[in-house]
Regions:
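Sec-dependent N-terminal signal peptides
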Residues: 4-13
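Bacterial Sec-dependent signal peptides at the C-terminal "C-region" and cleavage site
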Residues: 12-22
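Short, exposed beta-strand-loop hairpins at the edges of beta-sheets
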Residues: 113-116, 120-131
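Short, solvent-exposed recognition patches
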Residues: 20-110, 115-116
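Polybasic, low-complexity association/targeting segments
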Residues: 3-4, 21
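Surface-exposed amphipathic alpha-helical segments
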Residues: 125-143
Length: 143
């Protein structure tokens, strides 16, 4: 009897691999605001990306992901409370009123972060080639 119960228990158990995904996809910035208390203003399109999706970590972060034509993730912009630190090969430049920390690879910027005093922002081009001028224009359009 014990063996049968053990087999039933094993069959009914759900196996979870890895950590749960903390992101919740929402369909509007209004819903993101309700879940975090803040919004993230980004351009409607960026480079060759025509679509985007909004992800939220409740009370912590809003993320806008620009999607490739294949609906795979491309450029990512995040806004959260607190600060974000890049740990290697960085330089700080001034863009508008922000001291922007950027990590580069050749002529392209592969990660940037800055703060407005309350929120921190991150742009991860995720393989999208952005030069300094394109990144500066993008940063100045984010609020």
């Amino acid at each position: 009897m014990k063996k049968i119960l053990l087999i039933l228990l094993i069959c009914l158990t759900t196996i979870v691999n890895g950590a749960p995904n903390p992101f919740i996809e929402v369909n509007s910035m209004d819903k993101a605001f309700k879940m975090t208390g803040f919004t993230l203003e980004t351009p409607a399109t960026c480079k060759n990306y025509k679509k985007k999706k909004i992800n939220v970590i409740k009370d912590k972060m809003v993320e806008v992901v620009y999607l490739k034509e294949t609906n795979t993730e491309g450029l990512v912009i995040r806004k959260s409370k607190g600060t974000y630190k890049i740990s290697k090969d960085v330089k700080t430049i001034r863009i508008g009123n922000y001291d922007v920390i950027e990590q580069t690879k050749g002529e392209n910027i592969i990660l940037t972060t800055w703060t407005d005093g309350t929120y921190s922002y991150v742009v991860n081009p995720n393989g999208t080639e952005l030069n300094a001028e394109e990144m500066a224009k993008l940063i100045l359009s984010i609020k």
